[in-house]
Amino acid sequence: MQRFNSEVQALTTRPADADHFSVVPIEAADAISAARRIAEIAARRLYGDTGEVGFLSPQAAPGWYRAAIGEQRRSDDGIMLKGVTISIHVWPTD
């Protein structure tokens, strides 16, 4: 297990959804596992207990990830995720 620092930024044009924060070091097996845990924290921070992570994908630069977070809602086509996209940067503490 490694420890990872992180920064998170919500990518939104709505001021009510704007958020930028750092998370205390997270223990995880690798960077993408740390990013997944951080996305879960961000979802709960913005949406409370109903917050979910829709997807997590690596970006071109190492240590950078993008995730869709929000609340699952019923729709005509089934279930949709209403939320925001966040940018996550993780790096090892050591």
Regions found by a protein language model. Give the residues of each.
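Beta-strand elements of well-folded, non-transmembrane domains
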Residues: A10-R14, E27-D30, E71
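A short, exposed loop/beta-hairpin motif centered on an aromatic-Gly-Thr core
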Residues: D17-S33
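Hydrophobic beta-strand residues in large extracellular and virion-surface proteins
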Residues: F4-S6, I26, A34-A35, A39, ...
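A short, charged, amphipathic alpha-helix used as a generic interaction element across diverse proteins
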Residues: A29-G51
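Short, mixed-charge low-complexity intrinsically disordered segments
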Residues: R44-D94
